[in-house]
Amino acid sequence: MAFRKNKKLNNDFTKVTISLASPESILEGSHGEVTQPETINYRTYKPEMGGLFCERIFGPVKDWECHCGKYKRIRYKGIICDRCGVEVTEKKVRRERMGHIELVVPVAHIWYFRSLPNKIGYMLGLPTKKLDQIIYYERYVVIQSGVKSEDGINYLDFLTEDEYLDILDKLPRENQLLDDKDPNKFIAKMGADALETLLSRLNLDELSYSLRHAAANDTSQQRKAEALKRLKVVEAFRDARSRIENKPEWMIIRMVPVIPPELRPLVPLDGGRFATSDLNDLYRRVIIRNNRLKRLIEIKAPEVILRNEKRMLQEAVDSLFDNSRKINAVRAEGNRALKSLSDMLKGKQGRFRQNLLGKRVDYSGRSVIVVGPELKMHECGLPKDMAAELFKPFIIRKLIERGIVKTVKSAKKIVDRKDPVVWDILENVLKGHPILLNRAPTLHRLGIQAFQPKLIEGKAIQLHPLVCTAFNADFDGDQMAVHVPLGHEAILEASLLMIASHNILNPANGAPITVPSQDMVLGLYYVTKGRKSTPEHPIKGEGMAFYGAEEVVIAINEGRLSQHAHIKVKGIVRTDAGELVEQMIDTVAGRVLFNLVVPEEVGFVNELLTKKKLQLIIGMVFKIAGMSKTAKFLDDIKQIGFQMAFRGGLSIGLDNIGIPADKNTLIDGAKKEVDSVWSNYLMGLITDNERYNQVIDIWTRVNSEITDTLMKQLEADQQGFNPIYMMMHSGARGSREQIRQLGGMRGLMAKPQKNLQGSVGEIIENPILSNFKEGLDVIEYFISTHGARKGLADTALKTADAGYLTRRLVDVAQDAIINEQDCGTLRGLTVSALKDNDDIVEPLTERILGRVSVHDVFHIISNELLVSSGQEITEEIARSIDDSGIESVEIRSVLTCESRRGCCAKCYGRNLSSGQMVGIGESVGVIAAQSIGEPGTQLTLRTFHVGGTASNITVDANIKAKFDGVVAFDDLRVIQSTNLEGDKVTVVMGRSGEIRIVEPVSGKTLLSNHVPYGAFLNVKDGETVKKGQELCFWDPYNAVILSEFEGTIQFDSIEEGVTYREESDEQTGHREKVIVDTKDKTKNPAIIVNHKKGEPKGYSIPVGAHLAVEDGQDVKPGQVLVKIPRSVGKTRDITGGLPRVTELFEARNPSNPAVVSEIDGIVTYGAIKRGNREIFIESKDGVKKRYMVPLSKHILVQDNDFIRSGNPLTDGAITPSDILSIKGPTAVQEYLVNEIQEVYRLQGVKINDKHIEIIVRQMMQKVQIIEAGDTSFLTNQAVDRFKFREENDNILDKKVVVECGDSEKLRPGMIITARQLRDENSSLKRKDQRLVVVRDAEPAVSMPTLQGITQASLDTESFISAASFQETTKVLSEAAVRGKVDFLKGLKENVIVGHLIPAGTGQRVFNDIIVGSKEEYDSLIASKEAFNAARKGELQQS
């Protein structure tokens, strides 16, 4: 037993290795064997000797005092008492000393046979069920068949007890006396003992070789897969051998380590009871069973009893290691499963997440916050009592320094008495000592900021109103925590990096986040809003001209000039070119007051200030005037805002809300329209679904008309000085939606529905016609309650989802740090303005701003250089690129960055929170995760303000010309037909057709639109059209299938009750045939049109379609055969948004994926097999692909259509993995970025692309091996792409030995260099022996993969980071088998081991830097030079 006196862990280790513990290493770390199950003596409360709390093994219970009390005091330090054998030392050693239990029989470790992949099972090639039979002593297993091999008994055969005894009887006597190594001896065992023997006899290299051979050459796919699974485990052990000794037989336990007693305490409660850790119970069971087994073996008990006891011991050890894995877990009272060692690590309450990643912090306090409007940007108010407590040690030190007290104890008394001298000292201590304020939940880095404290009376912390947005704080009872940075570095970082006045921009999008809100905005809006004189309300001083701002202020103060008067004043204006010019300005008197605080280099701001305008102005001030002036500017506008809101006395009255006069006429009109839709329906002209959709559309339209009227009316009221209108228009409070409900009508509400996703809200078709001013009647109120409650319930549920998303994002991106200036890649992303139809969603300037260009970009016409390659695109450059008419620019992106670890500064571009290029060491991954996760919580909290009203999106059902020009058709198959009224119409039959509008002169395509199947054309090819003219229209509510020619209808497999059901409308009595899903897969409903002249043509019909024709009916070309109702008019709620974001980040396949074409080609329909329709696509070069499409899906292509690769054949969403395999990595990356952005855009949340790019980059780090070649990879293994490249480069130009000839060094299958081959062959040649035959080594082949963020986090290089994320036991057991080394490169693993994170000021580059003054350095250099010169002189003399 090793005795380590001072095992202090040195804290500058650079890597952590995990491996299996050998019995020897457990013994070495142990301080003694625990032999008794007793814990403590119930009378003396002293630990029992040899028990689980024994002092001899684990150390004394009291400092410097042995068990029997013979030695007390520190002077006997290190002595081992001769009476009780306890070492006299500190009691804290009971936290670190381990013990052990020596087991009589080995047991298997539950992690390695219960969790998948089953390590022991794969090593031996045994299935889990059979393995259990061995481990739990049900069967014998043959380890060596020996002489019995001729009787057909083979290695790894299973024997029942009878068979085993039978064989033993027939064996020759002397066989059992042979040595185990003798190949003739018959050996069969059971239990973990057998496994240990089997594992120790394995030859890993041979096993690996034979498995690789099987995986490469086996014909059966299943055996191939099996071999690969086994190879994974075998290779893991072989891989570990290169670093550390790691034997397979160590998965079997002979020694059980006993963790230190202080980590599993036993605490006496009052009333003579004890509270104990569950581990003590589990250990006790192991010891009791082990001792009983020992005794049974000594008294030579029968085999049956021994076997039972051995099995119980195995189960006891299983429960100790992992109790949650077992089916019959050991339970305490109240049927609660005991917490085993594994459970101590797992989950939110486990060691990793509870104690290593989130610790409680000393020097902290928390209190309620109140607003502090007179504070400066960098200040906060700290209650005196809190400050005195937080800074106690500092005060005590000063008290002793000043000689006021002599001892710490008396100083403490003074501080606790709160003597007046304490406040004096405290003022001094606080100078230049910032504190950190934090509001939970901390969703992004602005949730913790530093402030300079000001002492205040009272008990609440005062917070600056402008930082509330960043903290997401309000003053309705929020609490905040205060922390004190102690070290010099900490104080420096707090006051330079975290101080509130430096965090003006939001890292998510680079827009200012410290923007005035509520009262401040209202005040600023009010003061900068002008009004004209009217006879009843003359405005003082209207039309006056002033020489300067001071005159205006005097006039206002004297009461000669109203703040709202329109006046002329001389001021300095900033031109577009950025020069400041003096000129006369037409403005409003109040705006002059505002401009007094605007920094002069910005020029005169002549705007009506709303919240959005203020954000832009603050952004502009930040760019032009810099950070410190912006902070002062913010404080000033806060002052004006509050001041003016108070002066204006703005408040709401009931009369401020007017109800539009023509509300009732509009509603009556709508009711009439709805009635006519109903009568159409009752006559059977439209389906129920169409009726529903039309009714919803009517109400949506009327609602917005009423809202528009209401807004116009409010705006006209008192020249726009209606308080409610001002609040809404300025952005201070309230939205258009809310005002609509106050004065218009509440509108359509969502129907209660039982779907959790909330992706589609069906709408109740009777809207609420009243508004809140008129009051709702009972039924309207009742309908409203559902929406309101749903909003609140959603909020509660979604917050958790968003939080979990953030956690996964942080975990996947935590090691993305800027590690180098330039990775030197030549690749980039081509970006252009994002358009939705023709509305620009995001202009090119915004997408390229702050990025680095890949190439030189020249002006199209003048050919001047706009930006050179590798240069950051600033605001000016972006504007000039936009003005030059360049459509797209190739920019550097983290998606194409070639850095081995993290990414490089050039590919990342600008750091959004400072507006400068990003610095090395910035942890961009965490910033990205926070930027995406933080609005996620916002999105979820968006639903309940509007009170559950349904926002509806009306659908387009036509294409209008956006420009004047000439129409050109592309691939457009059309057919002439007549509609229901008998008029001639042109119907589109193809699905890939496009209408283009071409400029008549240059022939340039101005716009190209896809035309849906079944649309009616209003124009002809080559026709000239005007802007706004309708080109075509279609039925927005139904997708249709049309007949292509004249003929007679014949139904195929359309049988009532089997493939369709008659739905009769209760109201109309009309009966409709609706196709349903049938169990009988041979029945495939189709409509066949029998052509008068040619071939008949069949149309297969998807489930849910409505038939529009009868059997035997005559049809014309272009007539509708089938209507498939489109689900339109569904409300989009961000509830649908959050699961969508999750789905994209997890790279999950959507529930009904589309079948996608992999090649360009012509479509042909095949036969129908097993309920699937075959579709063939043949490309021009003769490649033919076959797709099986379920008949229940709607097929989007017709026979003989031309389809492009990556286009869907059926309806449904395209899966990301399809995009990856067909269009490649770049396409899938862009798809993910755009789709995720789309969800956030709908909510009006701006997130910069680069954040999402970083996460997507992390999802695409791995490649999948298709062919392993001669590398060490396995087929289907996921490998880091850089590792893959390295391994392939490594094997390049190497040779593989095919035949070794007469060489003694080389074996077949060895990989050697050309040099080794040359040397070996030349030496063989000299001896006239057979030469070595070789072939070139084959590199591995891989394909890019897309991993979900959870999978990517678990596959990270660092096992510590992965284990602290999810599936802790699985990650750790895998890592132990592999003997993994964690080099502590990411942030998370460093936090866990207690190091500084390798980012920012904690970069490892700074570790060895010595900080000194310039003078010292110069003097050192000078003296070194002088010394060298003197030395030189001496040498010359000698």
From Swiss-Prot:
Keyword tags: DNA-directed RNA polymerase, Magnesium, Metal-binding, Nucleotidyltransferase, Transcription, Transferase, Zinc
Catalytic activity: RNA(n) + a ribonucleoside 5'-triphosphate = RNA(n+1) + diphosphate
InterPro entries membership: DNA-dir_RpoC_beta_prime (IPR045867), DNA-dir_RpoC_beta_prime_bact (IPR012754), RNA_pol_asu (IPR000722), RNA_pol_N (IPR006592), RNA_pol_Rpb1_1 (IPR007080), RNA_pol_Rpb1_3 (IPR007066), RNA_pol_Rpb1_3_sf (IPR042102), RNA_pol_Rpb1_4 (IPR007083)
Single Gene Ontology BP annotation: DNA-templated transcription
Gene Ontology terms: cellular component: DNA-directed RNA polymerase complex
Enzyme type, top EC level: transferase
Keyword Nucleotide-binding in annotation: no
Family annotation (Pfam families): RNA_pol_Rpb1_1, RNA_pol_Rpb1_2, RNA_pol_Rpb1_3, RNA_pol_Rpb1_4, RNA_pol_Rpb1_5
Keyword Ion transport annotated: no
Binding site for Mg(2+): 474, 476, 478
Residues noted as binding Zn(2+) 2 in the record, renumbered to the chain: 823, 897, 904, 907
GO MF annotation, one: zinc ion binding
Cofactor: how and how many bound: Binds 1 Mg(2+) ion per subunit. Binds 2 Zn(2+) ions per subunit.
Binding site for Zn(2+) 1: 66, 68, 81, 84
Cofactor(s) needed: Mg(2+); Zn(2+)
EC number: 2.7.7.6
Subunit structure and binding partners: The RNAP catalytic core consists of 2 alpha, 1 beta, 1 beta' and 1 omega subunit. When a sigma factor is associated with the core the holoenzyme is formed, which can initiate transcription.
HAMAP family: RNApol_bact_RpoC
Stated family: Belongs to the RNA polymerase beta' chain family.
Function (record text): DNA-dependent RNA polymerase catalyzes the transcription of DNA into RNA using the four ribonucleoside triphosphates as substrates.
Protein name: DNA-directed RNA polymerase subunit beta'
Taxon lineage: Bacteria, Pseudomonadati, Bacteroidota, Cytophagia, Cytophagales
